[in-house]
């Protein structure tokens, strides 16, 4: 071993994907933006040793390090004298996980694993995405955010406050990774259906980016979660001694806007104009405004508006295969008129226009109910978004009355009002139409407009149901069993992000979210529809995300949105070459020898 080191040995890692600081196996297609062919992988020195390796979640393998690796990395003796495969480590984690009584405890186990061993964390998630998604994201992540101060273990992500204005570029330089391709940012004002959680909202960007990798295969080292802390108006948090954020009322107005402007500019200055920035859980007052302000200037989108719209429209398009008619034959009533409702409505209008329906006629098919009743022309204090969908109709106060008058084919709940779809509403829907569409999309489960069981029972199994949070299968008295579809945004944003990153897309038009919806709907088989599913099983989500990414990439090149040239001939192979794998890196010595005469020792 000593002789090997003396002949030019370097400690390296054998790579498995591109864009990593470690040496990995060459991908089937190059991951560089130029798309040029690369030669054989060259050794890259691994500079970390000892505790710096075992405490680095990107490098740590726990007891999966071989004896040779332990000796060369200076960690022999720092790990128990046992050698485990990743499969055995997975089994060990699963046994401990299954012994936990609460979902919050399970969440904590997974997050601490992510902090300790990133590869094993994603091996666990990808082993059963359907099982773990409700834990790492909705609905459990909402509970985790509410208890963030109590469960806080280790900082993850970048916390930028209103007091850091003027210095955001410096703060970004503190982040240990330079090759960031995706940022998820929130200001914590509207976390799921739970309201203002301030700094506790960091759990959302962390959870979203975990799904970027688990569902889409985006390299986690290229992802950055960000919390913009401008204060909180949640009095309970302001009184909480465990609260980890700024303890003052939210800063608004020009100072807030200046912070956002500086943040967007600093991110693109540091990581490039192609860096994807996903806005998450901003309040209605800011969500639309910031989307309209930045969408044509930066590579960004708002998941609550555009992601929710895409997954909801995907469910509706799949439902058309059950109702056996066209989108233009349907009338929609929304419970809620916030960012999610408006996003869905706008994308529905686009889909209707694609069917040949004029925009003015398409808008007439969409009725919205907010806290003050039906949105109608002439009603005071309507913002620009609501004015677009205001109907020429007398005022109506309740959702039940609107449903009776309009007789919609579909009702869509996105207002986080638990139980809003009453038995009377469901009975009316079932009496109006043979196959009524009922989407209870609010998160978390406690905020759902109705349960799957209630919908199927009241409509005698004729309701076409989808929800935002997961519900178990329902068996009716006649023996029929339905498996409700979950309209989870995770069907959308990982694939879109992967496609955007792959093509270096500068701006993300709404057409990308419509083609994503169409692709998701195509993934639903007739067997799934017969079971009540409007979405493909979550177990297939990585394959779905890959096909979405390829569609996005193809659209980008056809419409001159991509910035990487030349265009890859085999887009699927190219995207596959970028996908992160949770397989462990193999650390090895890069050994070689000089010619004997070159190594001869000179003597006096």
Swiss-Prot record:
InterPro entries: Aminoacid_DH-like_N_sf (IPR046346), Malic_enzyme_CS (IPR015884), Malic_N_dom (IPR012301), Malic_N_dom_sf (IPR037062), Malic_NAD-bd (IPR012302), Malic_OxRdtase (IPR001891), NAD(P)-bd_dom_sf (IPR036291). It holds the Pfam family Malic_M. This is NADP-dependent malic enzyme, mitochondrial. Belongs to the malic enzymes family. It catalyses: (S)-malate + NADP(+) = pyruvate + CO2 + NADPH; oxaloacetate + H(+) = pyruvate + CO2. One of its GO terms (biological process) is pyruvate metabolic process. GO terms for cellular component: mitochondrial matrix; mitochondrion. NADP(+) binds at residues 190, 304, 443. It is an enzyme of class 1 (oxidoreductase). Coiled coil: none annotated. It comes from the Eukaryota. Its EC number is 1.1.1.40. Divalent metal cations. Prefers magnesium or manganese. The record marks 304 as: Important for activity. SMART domains: malic, Malic_M. Keywords: Metal-binding, Mitochondrion, NADP, Oxidoreductase, Phosphoprotein, Transit peptide. The keyword Membrane does not apply. The modification Phosphoserine is found at residue 371. The gene is Me3. GO terms for molecular function: malate dehydrogenase (decarboxylating) (NADP+) activity; malic enzyme activity; metal ion binding; NAD binding; NADP+ binding; oxaloacetate decarboxylase activity. A divalent metal cation binds at residues 280-281, 304. Gene3D superfamilies: Malic enzyme, N-terminal domain (3.40.50.10380), NAD(P)-binding Rossmann-like Domain (3.40.50.720). The active site is at residues 137, 208. Residues 28-50 are annotated as: Disordered. It is found in: Mitochondrion matrix.
């Amino acid at each position: 071993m000593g002789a090997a080191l003396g002949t030019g040995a370097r400690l390296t890692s054998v790579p498995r994907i591109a864009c990593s600081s470690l040496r990995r196996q060459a991908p089937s297609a190059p991951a560089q933006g130029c798309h040029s062919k690369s030669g054989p992988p060259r050794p890259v020195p691994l500079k970390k040793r000892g505790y710096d390796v075992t405490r680095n979640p990107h490098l740590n393998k726990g007891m999966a390090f071989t004896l040779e690796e332990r000796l060369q990395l200076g960690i022999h003796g720092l790990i128990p004298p046992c050698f485990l495969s990743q499969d055995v480590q997975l089994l060990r984690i699963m046994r401990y996980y299954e012994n936990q009584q609460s979902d919050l405890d399970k969440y904590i186990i997974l997050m601490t694993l992510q902090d300790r061993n990133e590869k094993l964390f994603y091996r666990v998630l990808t082993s059963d995405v359907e099982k773990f998604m409700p834990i790492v994201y909705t609905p459990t992540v909402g509970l985790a955010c509410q208890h963030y101060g109590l469960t806080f273990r280790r900082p993850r992500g970048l916390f930028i406050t209103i007091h850091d204005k003027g210095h955001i570029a410096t703060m970004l330089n503190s982040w240990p990774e330079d090759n960031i391709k995706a940022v998820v940012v929130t200001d914590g004002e509207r976390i799921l259906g739970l309201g203002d959680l301030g700094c506790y909202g960091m759990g959302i960007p962390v959870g979203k980016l975990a799904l970027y990798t688990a569902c889409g295969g985006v390299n986690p080292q290229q992802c950055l979660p960000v919390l913009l802390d401008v204060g909180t108006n949640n009095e309970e948090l302001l009184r909480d001694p465990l609260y980890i954020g700024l303890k003052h009322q939210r800063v608004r107005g020009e100072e807030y806007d200046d912070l956002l402007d500086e943040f967007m500019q600093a991110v693109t200055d540091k990581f490039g104009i192609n860096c994807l920035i996903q806005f998450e859980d901003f309040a209605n007052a800011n969500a639309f405004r910031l989307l309209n302000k930045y969408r044509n200037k930066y590579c960004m989108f708002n998941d609550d508006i555009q992601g929710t719209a895409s997954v909801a429209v995907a469910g509706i398009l799949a439902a058309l295969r059950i109702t056996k008619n066209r989108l233009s034959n349907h009338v929609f009533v929304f419970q809620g008129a916030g960012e999610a409702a408006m996003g869905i409505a706008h994308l529905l209008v686009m889909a209707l226009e694609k069917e040949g329906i004029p925009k003015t006629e398409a808008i007439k098919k969409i009725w919205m109910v907010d806290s003050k009743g039906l949105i109608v022309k002439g009603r005071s204090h309507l913002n620009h978004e609501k004015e677009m969908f205001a109907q020429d109709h007398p005022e109506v106060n309740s959702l039940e009355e609107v449903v009776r008058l309009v007789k919609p084919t579909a009702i869509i709940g996105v207002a986080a009002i638990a139980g809003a779809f009453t038995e009377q509403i469901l009975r009316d829907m079932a009496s109006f139409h043979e196959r009524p569409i009922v989407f209870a999309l609010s998160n978390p489960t406690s905020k759902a407009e109705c349960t799957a069981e209630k919908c199927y029972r009241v409509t005698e199994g004729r309701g076409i149901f989808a929800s935002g949070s997961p519900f178990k299968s329902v068996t009716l008295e006649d023996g029929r069993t339905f498996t409700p579809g979950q309209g989870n945004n995770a069907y959308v944003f990982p694939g879109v992000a992967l496609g955007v990153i792959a093509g270096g897309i500068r701006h993300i038009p709404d057409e990308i979210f419509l083609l994503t919806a169409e692709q998701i709907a195509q993934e639903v088989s007739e067997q799934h529809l017969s079971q009540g599913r409007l979405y493909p099983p979550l177990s297939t989500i990585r394959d779905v995300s890959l096909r979405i990414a390829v569609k996005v990439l193809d659209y980008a090149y056809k419409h001159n949105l991509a910035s990487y040239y030349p265009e890859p001939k085999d887009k699927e192979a190219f995207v596959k070459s970028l996908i992160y794998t949770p397989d462990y890196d193999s650390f090895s010595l890069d050994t070689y020898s000089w010619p004997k005469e070159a190594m001869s020792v000179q003597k006096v």
